[in-house]
From Swiss-Prot:
The lineage of its organism: Bacteria, Pseudomonadati, Campylobacterota, Epsilonproteobacteria, Campylobacterales. CDD domains: Obg (cd01898). Signal peptide: none annotated. It is an enzyme of class 3 (hydrolase). Residues 1-156 form the Obg domain. NCBIfam families: Obg_CgtA, PRK12297.1, PRK12299.1. It holds the Pfam family GTP1_OBG. Coiled coil: none annotated. Monomer. Belongs to the TRAFAC class OBG-HflX-like GTPase superfamily. OBG GTPase family. This is GTPase Obg. InterPro entries: G_OBG, GTP-bd, GTP-bd_Obg/CgtA, GTP1-OBG_CS, GTP1_OBG_dom, GTP1_OBG_dom_sf, OBG_GTPase, P-loop_NTPase. It is found in: Cytoplasm. Keywords: Cytoplasm, GTP-binding, Hydrolase, Magnesium, Metal-binding, Nucleotide-binding.
Length: 360
């Protein structure tokens, strides 16, 4: 089950009470005070675990509390510190108190102190004085801290796939990565985000995210895509997946509508570096002309390159995809325009190298 938002209550432990006791030994008639200090309450930490990508483990478990400190003992023995509470979350988890962002947990194995446990109380040995040799008072431990927080997950990926329902995003991510999403010939097959690791060679790999298809009005709450757009906010490069075989909606119109929804949702997201993938090109007769025309629409000059082992008749890429792959000075210009077929794996091998270059 994929869960990306949950409310929980976290609490640190209470400090243990100090001890009231007096030294009692043979031949010692009136021993002095020897009550030990109470142990500090346990702390609460958030720890990032790279092996999980959902908050589902928090469903049904609302309270997360550290242990209380133990009471002080006799003979000046201090009480044991309360056991800490380690709350494990996936990378990309944000912790909110009300509407205010409190913690942003990104790095794997990162551990952040959230709440400090209450201080243990002092034993009566601390209160002996010249005028009070037999103090019968010890401090209580301080209370712990409790907070109601909201966990929001924003998946961390290098490449984010954006497209309309049934554009072939799930097929693509299953073809070039280790992800195994549900694939079927109907809209909204993808109901939750999918993450996949794309291995380019023995030394290089990157993470790709596929979210449910976006429809017109998604930024206003229609469809499924809007609730998951936040999962591509952290991506470095967006890849628009367009269905080149659609007769009712051409690739230019698909692109314009997708970009409009992104701009409405988040200008920052819309301004990310991006490329365009013309999917299902194996069933389009005039794919070369279509690609040239689309490049002209983006004010790009289509160019045939063999640097990435492209299929000979599908080698149209942005000129920036040269060996040095310099950054495009125009942030709104596509880094690449690549025709491919996720079903027949046409140009998908080359796509891995294209995306890796884009990330560099």
């Amino acid at each position: 089950m994929f869960v990306d938002s949950v409310e929980i209550i976290i609490a640190s432990g209470k400090g243990g009470p100090g001890m009231v006791s007096f030294r009692r030994e043979k031949f010692v008639i009136k021993g002095g005070p020897d009550g030990g200090d109470g142990g500090d309450g346990g702390d609460v930490y958030f720890e990032v675990d790279n092996n999980t990508d959902t908050l589902a483990s928090f469903r049904g478990t609302k309270h997360h509390k550290a242990k209380n400190g133990a009471p002080g003992g006799t003979r000046n023995c201090a009480g044991k510190k309360g056991e800490d509470k380690i709350i494990v979350v996936p990378p990309g988890t944000q912790v909110f108190v009300g509407d205010e962002l409190w913690l942003d947990l990104v790095e794997p194995k990162e551990r952040v102190l959230a709440l400090k446990g209450g201080k243990g109380g002092l034993g009566n040995a601390h209160f002996k004085s010249a005028t009070k040799q037999q103090p019968t008072y010890a401090q209580k431990g301080l209370e712990g801290v409790e907070k109601c927080v909201r966990l929001e997950l924003k998946l961390i990926a290098d490449i984010g796939l954006v497209g309309f329902p049934n554009a072939g995003k799930s097929t693509l991510i299953s073809t070039i990565s280790n992800a195994k999403p549900k694939i079927a010939n109907y809209e909204f097959t993808t109901l939750v985000p999918n993450l996949g690791v794309v291995s380019v060679d023995e030394k290089s790999e990157f993470l790709m995210a596929d979210i449910p298809g976006i429809i017109e009005g998604a930024s206003e709450g229609k469809g499924l895509g809007i609730s998951f757009l936040k999962h591509i906010e952290r991506t470095k490069v967006l890849a628009f997946v367009l269905d080149a075989s659609r007769l009712d909606l051409g690739i230019k119109e698909q692109y314009k509508r997708l970009r409009l929804e992104l701009e409405k949702f988040s200008p920052t997201l819309a301004n990310k570096p991006f490329g365009v993938l013309l999917n299902k090109c194996d069933v389009v007769e005039n794919i070369n002309e279509m690609t040239k025309d689309f490049c002209a629409f983006l004010n790009l000059e289509a160019q045939k390159l063999n640097a990435f082992d492209l299929e000979p008749y599908l080698g149209f890429l942005h000129p920036n995809l040269t060996s040095d792959f310099e950054n495009n000075p125009n942030e709104q210009s596509a880094l690449f325009v690549l025709p491919l077929s996720a079903v027949s794996a046409l140009n998908t091998h080359a796509l891995k190298f294209v995306l890796l270059k884009a990330l560099q």
